[in-house]
Structures are given as C-alpha cells and as structure tokens.
C-alpha cells in the first residue's frame, strides 16, 4: 500500500467546517434543488407526467416505499439520446444508487452508479439512446425522497480556455537517477522525462510545482530542505520539465510555501509586512531564474482581520511588481490555493488574482467523508463565488487520494487501490492493522471526477484542479483519473 501524508487542518477544525457546511446546505437546499440553469437543453423527463420526480416542481417529492432496492421508472415517450441526469434529494439519506435504461421497460442495462445524491447531483455518461430510465436506490439511511429527476442531452458550447491545473512534486526517484554514476547525462535526462509522463499534458494546462520551495520570515526564498537540492537536483529536473511542458504548451507555475509550524502565522506576518519588499524581490527572482510562468501561494490559513489586511496588501503589491519584473511581464499569473471558509479578500485583491484553486475536498459531508459531489463541488464553488471571485477565476479542486471518515490525517494514493475499486465506486475497505477493525476509505472514482469536470464546464467555471498528480495511474492506464477528465473534455470539444 502506497501511503503519503499531506498537511491538513486539524480534525477539530474539519469537524466544525463539516457541520457548518451541512448546516448551510440544509438552509439553502431549495436554492440548489432549483439549480438547473447550466444545461441549456430540453429536460426530457418532463415528458412523463405521471411521476412527482418529473413534474418540474421542487416542492413536490417522490417517496420510495422501501429504504433499499426501491425503483422508479421514467417513460420518455419515445427513444431519445441523452448523456446527463440531475437528481435532487430531499434530505441526506441515499447512500448508493444506480441508473439503468431500456427500450421495452423489461430488460434494463445499467449505465451509471454512485453513492450519494444529496441536494443536487449531476450524473454524466456516454450518450445513450433509450425510452425508459430507471432510478434504483440500492441503499438509504431512511426512506428516500427525491424532489426531481431531470434528463438531458447536454451539448455545451465549446471552450478553448478551460483550465486543468495540477499540483505535483518532483518525486524522490529523480534523485536516484541523477545520483546514478553509471548513466550519462543524456541517459539521465531521458529517464527523468519518462517520470514526467508527457501523456498527462495533452489534458493539463497548468503544472504547479509544489513542495520544494519555501519563504521565511526574513524574506528569503529557498529550497525546502537544503541548497544542495537546488544545486544538484532541482536545476536538472526543471530543465527536463520545461522541455516536456514547453512542447505541450503547458504553463509551469511555482508554489512558494509560507512559514508554517509553531508561530507560523506570526512568521508569515513578519515576512509580508516588515520584509515585504525583500520577499517580493526574492519570489520574482526565483521565478525568473527557472522561467516559471506564474507564482502560486498556499497560506493555510490567514485567520484574523489583521492577517487578511496584510495579506491583501502584499498580494496587490506582488502582482503589480510581477507585471513589470517577471520575465513574461503581463502574462505572469498569480494564483492562490483557497479554503472554503472565513475568506476576507478585498475586491482590489480579487481583481489581481488570475485564478484560485479551491480546496473543497477538505470539507466533510454529513457522514464524515471528504469530497462528495455536493459539498466539495457545488457548495464549495458557490461559496468562493459569493466571496466575489468570478466563475472564470475558479478551479474546482479534485483529490486524487482517499482518507478515512472524519478527515483523518492519513491519506492514501488512488494508484495504490485502483485495481480494487470500480469506476463507479468511491469506497475502499482498508484494514488498518491485524488488531483493529476495517475502516472505510473514501476516494473519488472516475465517475465522480468526470461528473465534477462536467459540472465545472457546464456551469462556466474557469477550470478544475488536481491534488496531486503523483497519486494517479500512468496516463495510458484506462483507470487513470486524469483520463476521466480528458475523456469528458475531448467529448465536449471535438
């Protein structure tokens, strides 16, 4: 089992966020239940006048007669092409559902399955042609209640500027290649390029290099572990990375991590106030040294008003200087990784940010699971937009890792368990040890990654974000999560 640890907020904070998110959702469920403006085509389900799920009224509810295994069939009147279903639940009970189709109302073929419906759930699949559509609730905590089931043949307007950003680390394997004295420099370069896996970058538009570079309270910018890493390894890796990405037309962005740990916020404050000029000079100098196309910042998290006031001022000055001092001038991008709570960015700051990577996957749903469709996609993006960011600035974040219920700090790469879950399954039962009980680990499957991509695309958001690329399978693997993004985008842009 491949295991990796990511710095996340404390369990206490996660639980508070989870409860707050669910509470807000409860209070605004009718808003999301009527959120159907992003698919500009006929709702085919309205042709069936006999079912409360298809009457076009969010106020009415279809009640299943059994918790598990209940079915309802929609008759479209004739065989139709469609590729999307929107489901709207009253309450938060459904834990597993499937969608099947038929032309004779007797023999059904399953085309989709997943776990939760919640207040708003987009389900996407390859275009099918059928007359009858069956919703089966396989498992539910209580009797399922469905407000609406909408069926569409969604054909969105083609976009050429949809972003697919990915956070990625250099990877320890690079060090071994560079240290191998039996290899020539050319052989080392070839092996490093193999690790980069260029196939991803037919889909990815922005590669955000994270984990290597930090700043400190004195305004210095340096390698995270030692200068030897930069001198011996980093320059070689960046040269090879540039060669691969430049050929694909992919932007290369650097995340410069802030001081963290004990008194981390105090150290950040000192750097962005007393040593601001030095810090900005060093950030831009590092970006110019390796010809990064942009700078990305990930302060987790400014909390007080004083911290936000200082950060707002710092970001505005950083962007202004990037326009004149970065090697690519006006084309240089400034991006932020954002949590989905307690943001206090001013309109002036928001205007100078090119895009934000929304870490909605940190929010837990009512069952303590991270990154469900509604909480991490619909609700998270909506919150960021309410704060003043435009749709075009927002990248909706996807986790390529799983974690236990409750947002535990141990997190596991998708590529470690991909052979053991289906494209529709988000759960993996993991035995922690021989002495402890099995635990559910929640991942994002290919199906939900495709659905979230479709939601971002159809709703007009700027793009999506992957955290983290090294958790995925190789680009040529049919089970790759990046492939799920790519397949949808190829379908709508062909």
Model features per residue range: what roles?
Residues 207, 297, 356, 396, ...:
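Conserved, mostly hydrophobic/aromatic
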Residues 254, 391-455, 475, 481-494:
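Glycan-binding loop/region signatures in secreted carbohydrate-active enzymes
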Residues 280-308, 360-362, 465:
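Active-site groove signature of glycoside hydrolases
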Residues 16, 24-78, 90-93, 152-159:
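Disordered, acidic Ser/Thr/Pro-rich linker "stalks" and the adjacent N-terminal cap
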Residues 171-183, 217-233, 301-421:
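Substrate-binding surface in catalytic domains of secreted glycosidases
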Residues 156-283, 370-372:
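Glycan-recognition patch characteristic of GH18 chitinases/ENGases
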Residues 79-91, 135:
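A short beta-strand element within beta-rich, extracytoplasmic domains
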Residues 67-69, 91-153:
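Trp- and acidic/polar-enriched beta-sheet ligand-binding modules for extracellular glycan
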